[in-house]
UniProtKB/Swiss-Prot annotation:
Name under which the protein is recorded: Electron transfer flavoprotein subunit alpha
Note on how the cofactor is bound: Binds 1 FAD per dimer.
Name of the gene encoding the protein in the UniProt record: etfA
InterPro entries, sorted: DHS-like_NAD/FAD-binding_dom (IPR029035), ETF_a/b_N (IPR014730), ETF_a/FixB (IPR001308), ETF_alpha_N (IPR033947), ETF_asu_C (IPR014731), ETF_asu_C_CS (IPR018206), Rossmann-like_a/b/a_fold (IPR014729)
Keywords: Electron transport, FAD, Flavoprotein, Transport
Organism: Thermoanaerobacterium thermosaccharolyticum (strain ATCC 7956 / DSM 571 / NCIMB 9385 / NCA 3814 / NCTC 13789 / WDCM 00135 / 2032)
Taxon lineage: Bacteria, Bacillati, Bacillota, Clostridia, Thermoanaerobacterales
Keyword set includes Flavoprotein: yes
GO terms assigned for molecular function: electron transfer activity; flavin adenine dinucleotide binding
Length: 330
């Protein structure tokens, strides 16, 4: 296994734009690589996407592997899996990291199977141990336990990483790097699915990981109707609605809104927690937010210890006042 070196990331892009999670895991890969004294490689797949190579180098990549093919214009499981598998067999990375997006979650296990290696899904922490192995930490048993996993006997070591967990890499346009174009053997016969048309996501699709502003409701909203005022505040701020696990478990809102250790990990510029007490599982999913505002009628709620600003009061009286004041500023 001495032939394997370097830490790679799958640089996920959609419509020619790098996803935030790609920049997040690139920053983490840079830290891990510096600890091991190896290079960071970024795998960029698509068609006419080579222009993103400079961005990846500026964010910390030493080498960008570009697989450009018209058949890879849109994501397909077979095409992307074959391209990355061929690339990994040729250059032998020690580690490959993917964002735990719907693409990453579909792609990573297919590559793990092709390369006959292991995969740890939904990681919230990564490190290097004294033997140089990748330590992969993820929630287990419903978020009540954090498990740290190693893959000592297979290469590459592979993980998917939750969006929002890692801090975005800092851009440095003075960095230099290398671009390697790789001609993967991709044919139409390799791809079993054909894309006939693409429909843009409906506006009501929740995208917590990419949101700059999140307004979340907890048990204190009293029931499913309580989310009406949460949504009203989110709308006036141009944000999205989040939720605690308790409200999801109670059936008040769908699970795609859930923030926390067993939900989504977020890092918005502004996070407003309404009627959320501050259980450790919830805090684990939003504690890295830029600014945290807590609204709770219990002055002893744990959430206030983590909030930048706290409002003690009935959220059904406080939020309407906030909404009116925000509207006046517009």
């Amino acid at each position: 296994m001495n032939d394997y070196k370097d830490i790679w990331i799958f640089a996920e892009q959609r419509n020619g734009k790098l996803m935030n999670v790609a920049i997040e895991i690139l920053g983490e890969a840079r830290k891990l690589a510096d600890k091991k004294g190896v290079n960071v490689g970024a795998v960029l797949i698509g068609h006419n996407v080579e222009n993103l190579s400079k961005d990846l180098i500026s964010f910390g990549a030493d080498i960008v592997y570009v697989v450009d093919n018209p058949l890879l214009s849109n994501y397909t499981t077979e095409g992307y899996a074959k391209a990355i598998s061929e690339l990994a067999k040729e250059y032998k990375p020690e580690v490959i990291l993917y964002g735990a997006t719907f693409i990453g979650r579909d792609l990573a296990p297919r590559i793990a199977s092709r390369l006959m290696t292991g995969l740890t899904a939904d990681c919230t922490g990564l490190d290097i141990d004294e033997n140089g192995l990748l330590l992969q930490t993820r929630p287990a048993f419903g978020g009540n336990l954090m498990a740290t996993i190693k893959c000592p006997d297979k290469r590459p070591q592979m993980s998917t990483v939750r969006p929002g967990v890692m801090k975005r890499a800092i851009r440095d346009d003075t960095r230099d790097g290398k671009v390697i174009k790789f001609d993967a053997d991709i044919n139409e016969s390799d791809i079993r699915t054909k894309i006939l048309s693409i429909a843009k996501e409906a506006k009501n699709v929740v995208n917590l990981e990419e949101a700059d502003i999140i307004v979340s409701g907890g048990r204190g909203i009293g029931g499913p109707d309580g989310f009406n005022i949460i949504k009203e505040l989110a709308d006036v701020l141009g944000g999205v609605v989040g939720a605690s696990r308790a409200t999801v478990d109670a059936g008040w809102i769908t699970s795609d809104h859930q923030v926390g250790q067993t939900g989504k990990t977020v890092r918005p510029k502004l996070y407003i927690a309404c009627g959320i007490s501050g259980a450790i599982q919830h805090l684990a999913g939003m504690s890295n937010s830029g600014t945290i505002v807590a609204i709770n009628k219990n002055p002893d709620a744990p959430i206030f210890k983590f909030a930048d600003y706290g409002i003690v009061g009935d959220l059904f009286k406080v939020i309407p006042v906030l909404i009116e004041e925000i509207k006046k500023l517009k």
